[in-house]
Amino acid sequence: MYRNIVFYLILLCLFISVVMKSFEVIRTIANVICFIFVLLYFKDEMKTYSRKALAILSICFLFLVGICAFIILQGQTLMKRHLFFTGLETIAGILLIIVSLSICTFILRKISNRLKRM
């Protein structure tokens, strides 16, 4: 029950963040609260890790977020320069985001499974 409530609160915060595009302060607050709700959602799973494993996992998460953002930004500029993507920018952008997030999720899951065995 607790996880369901937190899940719907995460969706609500994401919805507020998308709807309030012109209000930057409200959008920033919604993003921070969403991050807190995500941590609450995974609270029980985080208890299985040691402090060292959580530190390593946090560093890897921050590193992969930076890499994922870099891949998405460079992919967007690459798509704007090439004529091949003319008319397909939306589909190519969505595929770029899905592929980069999938790769980062795969790497983070592999690291997480290896740290659970420690």
UniProtKB/Swiss-Prot annotation:
The chain crosses the membrane at residues 5-20, 25-42, 53-73, 83-103. Coiled coil: none annotated. It is a multi-pass membrane protein. Keywords: Cell membrane, Membrane, Transmembrane, Transmembrane helix. Pfam families: YoqO. InterPro entries: YoqO. One of its GO terms (cellular component) is plasma membrane. It is found in: Cell membrane. The keyword Ribosomal protein does not apply. This is Uncharacterized membrane protein YnzK.
